[in-house]
């Protein structure tokens, strides 16, 4: 087991479902020393659970992290898009590395299987949205295999119980940021993102369907590119898999996927939350390894 002095000191801002699942993931890793879980409501179930796991908590939010800025190196921000824009003013001034799990689009957009190695010098890394983390690998794989994408549409369906307050409050930002990222990573001329929240009980597993009108010369190349990308995603999201292999009909390409969560804290059907947390952990692990390498040179 690594000594605490060799671990990256971590604070989690936000004590909802994403923050708590991150807490369990961080605590299970020998790379990190979890210092704080911080929220806004002293009586919240999230902070109560964190305390029961022997993690120091506070309901003073950003003010607490300002007062303890020397005690952590990395922050996972699992609040809201609006809150993150305020939070990052302090983190930027304080030189703190931030992994943003909101659709605020303040920092550099990251999908680990696409551009993780480019994140080394960034102060703020934005993980776009859960639907983005699911669909963007496939959108990027398409880009590698076709001549041009005229239109790209992504429809994600998630269980109502996995859509917390922050998710519902950020719907507009979710659409805008996902569509922006789809255009950026695929080069598509026009993009559209749709999020369906399914109230069915028991909760249904996250599913995402990608539709594209694209010009290509070899559809086998499309299939191969998508298959290769799925394996890259599965390196950090084991529950990621295709349910509809690439299909072509009258110029339209269809690909379907599902994400089964790891079940660290969230139920397995909440793959939408698990995939963005797995991406966050991949970014944090990369930064930890980069920092350790720099310290030995």
UniProtKB/Swiss-Prot annotation:
UniProt GO MF annotations: acetaldehyde dehydrogenase (acetylating) activity; NAD binding
EC number: 1.2.1.10
UniProt keyword Transmembrane helix, yes or no: no
Entry binding sites for NAD(+): 15-18, 162-170, 272
GO biological process annotation, one example: catabolic process
InterPro entries linked: Acetaldehyde_dehydrogenase, Acetylaldehyde_DH_C, NAD(P)-bd_dom_sf, Semialdehyde_DH_NAD-bd
Keyword list, A-Z: Aromatic hydrocarbons catabolism, NAD, Oxidoreductase
Top-level EC class as recorded in UniProt: oxidoreductase
Matches recorded under Pfam families: AcetDehyd-dimer (PF09290), Semialdhyde_dh (PF01118)
Residues forming the catalytic site: 130 (acyl-thioester intermediate)
Annotated catalysed reactions: acetaldehyde + NAD(+) + CoA = acetyl-CoA + NADH + H(+)
Family annotation (Gene3D superfamilies): Dihydrodipicolinate Reductase, domain 2, NAD(P)-binding Rossmann-like Domain
NCBIfam families listed in its UniProt record: ac_ald_DH_ac, PRK08300.1
Family: Belongs to the acetaldehyde dehydrogenase family.
Protein name per Swiss-Prot or TrEMBL: Acetaldehyde dehydrogenase
Organism: Burkholderia pseudomallei (strain 668)
